[in-house]
Amino acid sequence: MAKRYRAAAIGRTGSGNYGHGLHIAYAGIDKVDFIAVADPDGAGREQARQLTGATHAYADYREMLSTEAPDLVSVCPRWTDCHLEMVTACLEAGAHVYCEKPMTWNLADGDTIVNRADALGRKVAVAHQAVYLPRIQQLRVLLREGRIGQVQQIHAHGKQDRRGGGEDMITLGTHLFNMMRYFAGDVGWMSGHVTVDGRELEPGDVGEATEPVGPVAGDCVEAYYAFDSGVAGFFDSRRDQAGSSQRYGMEIVGSEGTISLRGGAGSELMIYPHPVFRPAAADQGWEPLEGLPDDPLATGNRLAIVDLIEAVEQDREPVSSARNAVAALEMILGAYEAQISGGRVAMPMARREHPLVAWRERQNT
């Protein structure tokens, strides 16, 4: 008889809530019984219980873990200040975890989660939903089959709204960096330039983000990534740019064409099937990339849970694993490290503390 999985979710109403619906991703999944939610807020807890159909609800997530012994747990809050404690508690209780992004705000905490999961034989998946979508997975197949020739460059762009710069880079950029790695593999080294009002970054520019996702700095970030595969990667984000709602996405440039992916789920996917970009050429234009499914980004949560179960049963890494999350975070924090050091940053980064925290501490001693 096939194993059935007992699932639960941890939320924190008013302090990161339930993220982007990580608690409601289990509905209709074969082999899963959703049994419990935990939330210190009474009203939020009851609402989550009703939405998920959970039999039990707890104010204390540790009590839930001890009493219910779930096999799968969603760590839902958007805020990263609780992720290390919650994820490690789940792992130590014997559960596999689906965690909201960013998984951690610093590399040391991410390393702790990766190492603890390995030691306990547990899997951790992270809510970078796009890479679970059939549309994005099939796009990777097309790239590997040479649809645009040899992939040479990936240009990624943040949303560039009021959070543009450093906050955009951690809040939404984490999806882009994870996707860049999904297409191009590991980064060998990187460089970056972070500025405020056109001047070089100073220690006094370091502040907190709108939500607790670690320290941020800069209203303009431009970064370069040298992938081991030979692909050159670029990221840019500036604060309060015109058309910010349409900027988020990337262009994948190949030797024989270019693919434009706009939005988190790549719902606006176009191809320029020509080796040289010639806007004036009447016979050369952008075309829809046909034949790929178009699923909403939220579908990725359900697919991530299905993949997590398969990863457990096949003893493999999830598509978007804790290791992937740490590597994406390195691409973010490496921009600060490059700005502060004034040079290239080798990957993986040698120093695992947050570069902005370490910089401020050095300035204060």
Predicted features by range, described:
Residues 1-4, 9-10, 72-74, 111, ...:
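C-terminal helix-rich "cap/oligomerization" subdomain common to oxidoreductases
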Residues 1-52:
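N-terminal Rossmann-like dinucleotide-binding module
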Residues 13-19, 123, 130-215, 342:
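Predominantly a Rossmann-like dinucleotide-binding segment in NAD(P)-dependent oxidoreductases
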Residues 36, 56, 72, 153:
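Short, Asp-centered acidic motifs that coordinate Mg2+ and/or phosphate
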Residues 54-60:
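Conserved SAM-binding strand-loop segment of SAM-dependent methyltransferases
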Residues 67, 72, 78-79, 83-132:
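Beta-strand-loop-alpha-helix segment that lines the small-molecule cofactor/substrate pocket
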Residues 175-270, 302-318, 333-335, 350-365:
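Contiguous beta-strand/loop segments that form the cofactor/metal-binding neighborhood of enzyme cores
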Residues 293-305:
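Active-site loop of classical SDR/Rossmann-like NAD(P)-dependent oxidoreductases
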